[in-house]
A protein has these predicted regions:
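ATPase/helicase motor core of nucleic-acid motors
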Residues: 87, 262-263, 305-309, 332-456
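Conserved helicase NTPase motor core
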Residues: 3-14, 18-22, 33, 52, ...
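Helicase P-loop NTPase motor core
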Residues: 22, 26-34, 96, 102, ...
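Coupling/switch/interface segments within P-loop NTPase motor domains and analogous charged loops
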Residues: 109-177
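Proline-centered turn/helix-capping motifs that create local helix->coil transitions or kinks
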Residues: 141-147, 288-298, 426-431
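P-loop NTPase Walker
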Residues: 1-103, 107, 176, 199-200, ...
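Short glycine-/polar-rich loops that comprise or flank the Walker A/P-loop
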Residues: 18, 46-50, 75-78, 112-113, ...
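Conserved nucleotide-binding/hydrolysis micro-motifs of P-loop NTPases
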Residues: 28, 58-61, 85-88, 139, ...
């Protein structure tokens, strides 16, 4: 089961008696270590259902699940391999009743949150300001602050105003039986922190927790991990301080600093052999990150040979840069016999808006290409419309889903009619959908608006 692992990887896999931090440099086989450790735990007799492997994206979780399946076969389906937020959904659906949430609660997307925050602010705020408030509220939640705590810590009038809006926003979420993305971490943390019976349940359920991309965890995720593993501290955190790039959304390297303090028996294993790049590339990368402050110093090395030297090219403009890149690709293909396939080349850029010049240059050269990323299938308007209908079917208190459903397709129901319905629902402390069935509604709405709503 451990064939093909180097000595450092074997050390990380075989240490199962306490807390373990695996410092995994880029391309050092961290996913391999995680999946082999899952297999090793099962080999030693642990129930697959007692193992949780947590990562940050659904794509990474799917890849990990597939690689675990290759190692342990059908047992992989019993291992909890998921994102932090997927774990949060499961915890709140199972135990959220103590927080006043039904198991059928709705999970709001970014657009829903934006609309509710605008409504909480009085409905007259411009979109850009509402987005800024949304970002601030999200950051506060990632720091573990509720509205009252945010108000107490506010530095100025602007932050105090946002904290007040946050309180109204939270009231609306509660009324709608809905949660946002950040709640999927903060609510499980509240469950574990405030309800001993829930904490005992999850600590007894999970015998070992593995966390991928640990350097990207924020304060609430760290606290959640601590409460999940309890005093036994049976966990494996896999990360790299040199790859921490999400500080702007709450990720903190303090979580790496805290581990040796909170878990004095922490075993630290460094994975320094890179299996992806040549020595020339690694030397350049080591020189770039060399001046960075180091929590745990390490130096990556490769046994793939020296390789081609790294070239740095000065360009006059974005268009010139794109043309040079395309010319380089064409030159490399022309020099090889047989020429490599187009899919053997990649162009990396920092942000999506930088793709356009490269796309134009590739089109001019008649080179086939594929842009990774872009709009998610679930972000398409028609898919959001369909999902809103399903959400409303499952949870009739989901006001954001109602507002999207009632407007698609168009039924002649305007903003004023919906505002009147909203006022009626607020006055009678009910959801928008439930308000449609109130015998008092006809007296509150114009006949035409009422007919359109009842037709819905």
């Amino acid at each position: 089961m451990s064939a093909g692992l180097n000595l450092a990887q074997l050390q990380a896999v075989h240490y199962t008696n306490g807390p373990c931090l695996v410092l995994a440099g880029a391309g050092s086989g961290k996913t391999r270590v995680i999946t082999h450790k899952i297999a090793h735990l099962i080999e030693r007799g642990m129930d697959p259902k007692a193992i949780a492997a947590i990562t940050f994206t659904n794509k990474a979780a799917a890849e990990m699940r597939e690689r675990a399946k290759q190692l342990i076969g059908r047992q992989a389906k019993n291992v909890l391999i998921c994102t932090f937020h997927s774990l949060g959904v499961r915890m709140v659906r199972e135990d959220g009743k103590v927080l006043g949430l039904k198991p059928q609660f709705s999970i709001l997307d970014s657009d829903d949150v934006h609309s509710i925050i605008k409504d909480a602010a009085g409905g007259t705020t411009d979109a850009a300001t509402a987005r800024q408030w949304q970002w601030t509220i999200s950051l506060w939640k990632n720091m573990g602050l509720n509205a009252q705590e945010a108000l107490a810590q506010a530095k100025d009038d602007n932050e105090r105003s946002i904290a007040v809006i946050m309180a109204r926003y939270e009231e609306r979420l509660s009324a709608y039986q809905s949660v946002d993305f950040d709640d999927l971490i903060s609510l499980p943390l509240k469950l574990l922190r405030d309800f001993p019976e829930v904490r005992a349940k999850w600590q007894n359920l999970l015998g070992h927790v593995l966390v991928d991309e640990y350097q990207d965890t924020n304060a609430t995720q760290y606290d959640l991990l601590k409460l999940l593993v309890g005093e036994r501290g049976h966990f494996t955190a896999v990360g790299d301080d040199d790859q921490s790039i999400y500080g702007w959304r709450g990720a903190t390297l303090d979580n790496l600093k805290k581990l040796p303090l909170d878990f004095p028996t922490l075993q630290v294993v460094k994975l320094e052999q890179n299996y992806r790049s040549t020595s020339a590339i690694l030397r350049a990368a080591n020189n770039v990150i060399g001046p960075n402050p180091k929590l745990f110093p390490k130096t990556l090395f490769s046994e793939l040979g020296e390789g081609e030297p790294v070239r740095v090219v000065d360009c006059d403009s974005e268009e010139h840069e794109a043309d040079r890149a395309v010319a380089r690709i064409q030159g490399l293909r022309a020099a090889a016999n047989p020429p490599p396939e187009w899919r053997g080349f990649a162009i990396l850029y920092r942000a999506n808006h930088m793709a356009k010049p490269f796309e134009k240059a590739l089109r001019r050269a008649s080179i086939p290409y594929k842009v990774s990323g872009g709009t998610s299938f679930f972000d398409r308007a028609e898919i959001k419309d369909l999902c809103a209908w399903f959400r409303l079917w499952i949870n009739s208190n989901d006001d954001p889903a109602f507002l999207r459903s009632v407007g698609t397709p168009k039924r002649g129901i305007g903003h004023q009619s919906l505002a009147q319905l909203g006022g009626f629902a607020t006055q009678h402390k009910t959801s928008l959908f439930a308000a449609l069935f109130s015998p008092m509604l006809p007296a509150a709405l114009p006949r035409r608006a009422l007919d359109s709503l009842l037709e819905f």
